[in-house]
């Protein structure tokens, strides 16, 4: 991509090509593309690309009805332009002529002008035959999920359709109030003064969590730059609460990026000695930014959680460890819809193996009577309850501790997407017995 402002539709198509053909994530591609876009076009590109990922099978089925010969090689970008055009026509309030013309004109910008007529013809044929085409397509279009994931969810959850429906919805915006500055009630009042509607209707939520009825830019949040609030899903906010760090304790936040959990730990225990670890240096930039905004201090380190000896002195042990383990992220598909197409069935066993290695390595660095909170944003038992059962079976010095979710007790807790308005999360809390 060239470093100049260009068509938002062309950029959206190029991003989708990277997702579908090269396995890149939207969370990486969109920030990288922002320098090529006018600021006003960034939300449009986000809406188009995230939206396409949510409903991809339906759009692909429509293209199959309209294009007799698959678009391959260089023309794959034309295929992605058609995805952009169809998404606009079906799901966005953009005038039809503008939706079509912008995509057709983009063929020239991406040096595929020879496909201009085909692109125009396909989109206009869809408009003429939309009712007939959708009647055919929608007989078979149902879950908008890859077959391997549908099968996994069917085996575990009787309400698998509800889960997938939830995955296809737009996620709400949750914030975490920094109680070092004000109470959640007072912050809700500040939002109310700005005519921002909020809710926190479920009892099974951290007290710091507030849901905004309509998403809001962070620069519009009261005193955001001064650290009064952080954007974080309500179920993710249980991580630090369950850890229950105390001032003076030695704490490890493993897999810490982008820093929401690290900062929450320090909001609750400002004098705790926290090491924030992540394997990617580039991801630690966000951790440092979040710490600075909130005026908090942690020891930020780049390292592999499976090999603590490479980033930690041999005699250092932790009172508490928060392990938000690498996972399939199947609980946050509504926030990252590209996950459906980036993950493969074979990834799950590899992730389970990695989680087990990290658990084992970090367990040796936990003090006797110390606690470890294991968390994932997955809804697959292999990464969650099965992983924990296998671990405590293999480690006689590990025991599960009952957790309290505002009066709802559990020794292992699986939140599903949309439950309480939150993302899918799993939690288990382990104590290391002094043997």
Curated annotation (Swiss-Prot):
Lineage: superkingdom: Bacteria
Keyword Transmembrane: no
UniProt-listed CDD domains: AdoMet_MTases (cd02440)
InterPro entries cross-referenced by the UniProt entry: MeTrfase_RsmB-F_NOP2_cat (IPR049560), MeTrfase_RsmB-F_NOP2_dom (IPR001678), NusB-like_sf (IPR035926), NusB_RsmB_TIM44 (IPR006027), RCMT (IPR023267), rRNA_ssu_MeTfrase_B (IPR004573), RsmB-like_ferredoxin (IPR054728), RsmB/NOL1/NOP2-like_CS (IPR018314)
EC number(s) from the headed UniProt entry: 2.1.1.176
First-level EC class: transferase
GO molecular function annotation: RNA binding; rRNA (cytosine-C5-)-methyltransferase activity
Binding site residues for S-adenosyl-L-methionine: 255-261, 278, 304, 324
Keywords in alphabetical order: Cytoplasm, Methyltransferase, Ribosome biogenesis, RNA-binding, rRNA processing, S-adenosyl-L-methionine, Transferase
Record's catalysed reaction(s): cytidine(967) in 16S rRNA + S-adenosyl-L-methionine = 5-methylcytidine(967) in 16S rRNA + S-adenosyl-L-homocysteine + H(+)
UniProt subcellular location: Cytoplasm
Primary location: cytoplasm
A GO cellular-component term linked to this record: cytosol
Active site annotation, chain numbering: 377 (nucleophile)
Protein's GO biological process: regulation of DNA-templated transcription; rRNA base methylation
Family recorded in the similarity comment: Belongs to the class I-like SAM-binding methyltransferase superfamily. RsmB/NOP family.
Biological role: Specifically methylates the cytosine at position 967 (m5C967) of 16S rRNA.
Name this polypeptide is given: Ribosomal RNA small subunit methyltransferase B
Organism, as annotated: Haemophilus ducreyi (strain 35000HP / ATCC 700724)
Origin organism lineage: Bacteria, Pseudomonadati, Pseudomonadota, Gammaproteobacteria, Pasteurellales
